[in-house]
Amino acid sequence: MSAVVLAAVISTLTLEGDLTPEGGDYLVVPFEVPAGTVEILFHHQHDTPGTTLDFGIEDPGGFRGWGGRLGEDTVIGEQESSRCYLTGPIEPGTWRIDIGKAFLSADRVHWTATLEFRDAATVEPRPRADFEARVLEPGPRWYRGDFHVHSHESGDASASFEAIRDLARARGLDFVNLSDHNTVSQQALVAAFQSSIDDLLFLRGSEVTTYGGHGTSVGNDVYIEHHIGRDGVTIEDTLDAAAAAGAIFIINHPELDLGDGDACIGCAWSYGDAGIDRVSGIELATGSYDYVPVFGRQVLAMWDEMLDAGAHVTGTGGSDDHDAPIEPPASGDSQIGTPCTVVWADELSEAAIIEGVRRGRVVVKLRGPDDPMVELTATGEDGSTAMIGDTVRASQVALTARVEGGAGMTLVLWRNGAEDESVVVEGDHFAHEFVRTTAAGGDRYRLQLAEAFDVVITNHIWVEPGAQPPDDGGCGCSSGGGRGGLWWILLALVWLNRPRHRACTSSGHDALHHPHHRAGRRPDPVPLRTSGSVGDQ
């Protein structure tokens, strides 16, 4: 931001104090803004090496910005503000410094804040625009993206919008969600940036970064409350705020516990099942593939516990990229698109991508967009069909797995959170059928494709019990006589001898990918170990 004019300083205020572990995670310090103020310069520091403090500002109306551990001087103004902070009127009256005790390395930490009140703007405004709901591409298909990307509007990140765009394009992504820490300062800026881009969709969002867990909100243009424990705020309140803003909420890196210290403060999810009915998603993988062997199985177990409890939570992925490096990063670092979240959506728009996640129509590629594509479809006795995320009612179901590009890998069918059956993928165009009888309480099925560790994970198809044949000791006959038993025998014969056609040829590709759950019949499942063409386009 370049200088515009020299401003006169109306007044300067210095505040200081001590922080201890007692008294909660946050300290709020009020201060008065004099009339005539157009811009505020904010500087803060503390005296204890190894300590991490977070800082934000609240105006009389509430949230004004959250720089977190950002140590640089901050400008908050009517015409322009520093990164992480909102631009707008400087209302005279009582404002507040918001201090978060992220990590205290001593029993007492001394902090100092200096505020300078100016009568004129000193920085050039950046282009801003209101959000415009855009459709960048019509039509349903699998769209590839990343729900967890930080821009320079996060206090601990450096990536410009241009760098994010260039890297996302290079990796073949269709969308990215800007999940900047506890702020929406990026929203108007990226709306202006989006106006000249037609091949990459930027989603509105933020990372709600608390000291007990992080989560991405997708679809909000207002700040989501993150001060858990302050003024009685609970995680349920935060989830309610996200829902009220029209956003979905995805739990980020839920098992990323790096122990004591400030390596990743509050990264692991510690809120248990509180408010889980308001959670739309959970990151199955975050950042570098190097983390999959360390945290992968723990996250899957947590996900299955949620599903066992009845929550239809969608598995997603997110890079947590902070720098947008165009070259592949060193081991352990993240890059946009690793992992890649592939969403079946009716079009490339924010609303359609969000709806795809709500419906569970998601496949996660843990290494990136070039990983194999895995799909799962289900067909019931009556011809009703389901794709990933759907529910089908059937007493017996045919599950068809299709893999593109995974020759030599192992494909595992998971049923209700347990490994059910595995097959070796024989070729780069592979299909396999599993036939299962539905349990009395229903079933859920997903696929995991692996080498040494998981490479691709699908979301679930849900199967509810259909009309069951009468209990006659296994003969299939009705105990009351009549034609009931014969009917079920004939139905079984029709089922076992139904015509099968190769549905995954290149000419039938579009038909394969359009969901018609309970609204018509898809092509019949392909025979075991047949070849064809399938992919995420």
Outline where the language-model segments fall.
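Surface-exposed beta-strand/loop patches in noncatalytic accessory domains
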Residues: 11-22, 45-82, 92, 419
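Noncatalytic modules at the cell exterior or secretory-pathway interfaces
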Residues: 38-41, 87-108, 442-446
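C-terminal functional module detector
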Residues: 120, 133-136, 310-314, 321-470
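A metal-dependent hydrolase metal-coordination microenvironment
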Residues: 130-271, 277, 283-303, 318-328, ...
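Juxtamembrane/start-of-transmembrane alpha-helix segments at the extracytoplasmic/lumenal side
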Residues: 475-487
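A cross-kingdom C-terminal cell-surface attachment/processing module
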Residues: 485-501
